[in-house]
Amino acid sequence: MGEYRLAVDIGASSGRVMAGKISEAGIDLQEVYRFDNQAQLMGGHYCWDVDHLFGEIKKGIRVAVQSGLQPVSIGMNTWAVDFVLLDEKGERLTDAISYRDPRTNGVMEGVIETYGKKALYERTGIAFQPFNTLYQLLALKKQNPELLEQAHAFLMVPDYFHFLLTGVKVNEYTNATTTQLVNVHTKDWDRQLLKEFGLPCGMFQPLQHPGTKIGSLTESMEKELGVQLEVIVPATHDTASAIAALPEKQTSVYISSGTWSLIGIENRTPICSQQAMAANFTNEGGVGSRIRFLKNIMGLWMIQEVQRLLPGHWSFSQLAQAASESTYTGEIDVDQHRFLKPENMIEEIQQACREKGLAVPESPGDLAKCIYDSLIASYDKAVTEIEAISGKPYEQIHIIGGGALNKEINQRLANRTNKTVIAGPTEATAVGNLLVQAIADGELSRIEEGRALVRTAFPVTYFLPQRSESHVSSRFESAKVQYEQLGIDVEAAFAKVKQVPISVHCWQGDDLHGTEVIANELSGGIDVTGNHPGRARNGEELRRDLEKALSLIPGKHRVNLHAMYAETDSVPIERDQLKTEHFEKWVKWAKSLGIGLDFNPTVFSHPKAADGLTLAHPDEEIRTFWINHCKACRKIAAYFGEQLGTPSLVNIWVPDGYKDTPSDRLTPRKRLKESLDAIYADEYDPMLVLDTVESKLFGIGSEAYVVGSHEFYLNYANQNNKLYLLDTGHFHPTEVVSNKLSAMLLFHDQLALHVSRPVRWDSDHVVTFDDELREIAIELVRNDALGNIHIGLDFFDASINRVAAWAIGTRNMAKALLYAALMPHRHLKQLQDEGDFTSRLAMQEQLKTYPFGDMWDEYCKRQGVPTETEWLDVVKEYEQQVQLKRESEKAKQR
């Protein structure tokens, strides 16, 4: 195991060369090279520039080789139906004309009239689409019959690329089935059908199934690329490769969502009934001789075209956001052929709306919502048809491919169909391609083993059916009236809170074990109780759990790391030697999510912290070790800021103190000050690094005296222009942080806040929606300080599901901010200034019974996250599908 393979995945708008390998840890997948693709007008037809594409493929191979990956095999997949013809010398006779070219107009209708729809469907099982290869060949026969006479080889686009690499001509089975020329029962070319349509049988190559090794690179190609690769035919139809990586068992309807949306189920035998034909379902080939019973739906092509035509630079995420805010309600039939290649997609959509008597969408948000709602309606109809035709109910819809990232569609589809929608992996096509190559080389025994790997290697997101949007919206509208009667701008409150990032602490996910090779016992007064199953065991699992938690939390996110989460490839690295390279996986992950990273030196749980002293230690060697560790952490934080485009808050907290009354309080504090001065000697751009210091009043092992007390760090921060961090669990039980914030804000431009929940002497319980949390949020909102505060969480609880702990705590922080934003602060201040304390108290109490829950549900709904009654079901599903499997794996290892 462990050899890299290359999967070339080309779609209608772009192509990628992906590298992947199978290992004991799962599947390592990385993008090596990306390039654009677009049909171009050539010789009067819309064509794919296959020469350009093959040049890009070769560039990608070279990049992989030059990066030291040492790939051993390669396989190509593309879209379906399009082809080239070769002459007897292997030279191309035709361009690869696109399926969107109008040359086939009217051809399909003529075939149906002369041959009969039922007869053709019973033989091929393929849906009637005007761009099918059969109709392209018949158009070519009519327009350029001499080309068919000269043709010695028919190769579909990925077959052609394989030929250019090896000199070997083959037709791959899954893609060949889309031609409407393969017999669905024999799974071979239908020679009788070819003769009846007057197509030369000799140009069609023997069908090869996915996993066939067709040869190595030609000598000239090997020399040009500087590598020897074995070419293994995957499922060359991109959808077939994507379905091969479907992580769920056969209990789901799948949607392979990209430029096209292909919705269906996987069968062992075809369904060629009258009902299937009437609904225009197709029976395409799959990996392992399976049948992909599916329906072609327009997919994201329409939104891609709208995005291309809109003035300005609209991203797909911006369009999705605009759609979520739109009130447009019209739906059109996205499966009409008029949307295949219109001159102007926006005008075509608007005209379709006019013809149906619908309001005409004008704004980007209305256009996007019209497309999304229409797609969802088409999906819903297809699911209903699948259940009726197959005679089986399906409880889940699994979306794979790039469209799985569209939370707006995913949630609305779950609501409309009343089925759980599972989204991911997004790179299913490349993964399926690689799995087939691995099976061919004996790394995996069969596709089921590969799918099991996918289940553990790639995170998925669950979207459960929510209460009907009209129900949530109607309750919200009713509640909104009550709040507006108090003079509150509800929409402004939503917008304000949505922009506040909350930094989620990674250490909740693994009970502060970290990922260091050198195992260290917890120290510094830190302890984690509980043993709930499913603890993350490595960085990949921790990131996967974090992604699941973040998918349940509305608003902006950040993630807070400790230095003990370095990933050093099994090489022991001391903390004072940590480098940016040890956090590259975290940065790559954060980039993929568009979030920032905050950072903390880990100045505990180490032999050099065993006696409870670190930066204040009397031993200079130990102090120097920790100084160098903190310096390394600031450098790593600067790397985070540079790579992610947002400052990284790097926070220093040390456990230094004494259990009993010390005989010298001053000297340890002098040493701590000198250590901090040494750490901060190097200047960093505040656009990259925000230096923060955190105090504590007492702790286990420092009950009598803490070196870095509140007074110490407050004065140090003031004198040295550092941010002061208030931790809600680091003060005496009679003190509350909400009472300190206004005093601090008078003298500090920025503050940092760690939100926890103290319980007696323990400071780090899961945050609940209690009075103090609400008061903290109220202080920040009414003093207009949300832009001056950096909010993070800091708790750890191993007695409950760790993802649930993240969700509960962070949702409560966001909930408290929204609660505060929906208060009439100006009026309450006025009552106080006027001395009308009776009215002030009455209003404060009255607000506690306002329908805030309806506001919160609407806020969550708009951002595509589960409401208060729904998120726990998602966590329980994740626990069953992912976290509990870790326990069984640990048991096997024992």
Curated annotation (Swiss-Prot):
Coiled-coil residues: none
Record's GO cellular component terms: cytoplasm
InterPro entries tied to this protein: ATPase_NBD, FGGY_C, FGGY_N, L-rhamnose_isomerase, Rhamnose_isomerase, Rhamnulokinase, Xyl_isomerase-like_sf
Keyword set, alphabetical order: ATP-binding, Cytoplasm, Isomerase, Kinase, Manganese, Metal-binding, Multifunctional enzyme, Nucleotide-binding, Rhamnose metabolism, Transferase
UniProt-annotated binding residues for Mn(2+): H730, D762, D764
GO molecular function: ATP binding; L-rhamnose isomerase activity; manganese ion binding; rhamnulokinase activity
EC number: 2.7.1.5, 5.3.1.14
GO biological process, any: rhamnose catabolic process
L-rhamnose isomerase: annotated span: 466-894
KW Membrane (keyword) present: no
Coarse class of the protein's main subcellular location: cytoplasm
Catalytic activities: L-rhamnulose + ATP = L-rhamnulose 1-phosphate + ADP + H(+); L-rhamnopyranose = L-rhamnulose
Pathway(s) annotated for this protein in UniProt: Carbohydrate degradation; L-rhamnose degradation; glycerone phosphate from L-rhamnose: step 1/3; Carbohydrate degradation; L-rhamnose degradation; glycerone phosphate from L-rhamnose: step 2/3
Location(s), subcellular: Cytoplasm
Cofactor(s) demanded: Mn(2+)
Domain of life of the native organism: Bacteria
A matching Pfam family: FGGY_N
Region of interest (Rhamnulokinase), residue spans: 1-465
Cofactor detail note: Binds 1 Mn(2+) ion per subunit.
HAMAP family: RhaA
Similarity annotation: In the N-terminal section; belongs to the rhamnulokinase family.
Protein name: Bifunctional enzyme RhaA/RhaB
Organism of this sequence: Shouchella clausii (strain KSM-K16)
Gene name as annotated: rhaAB
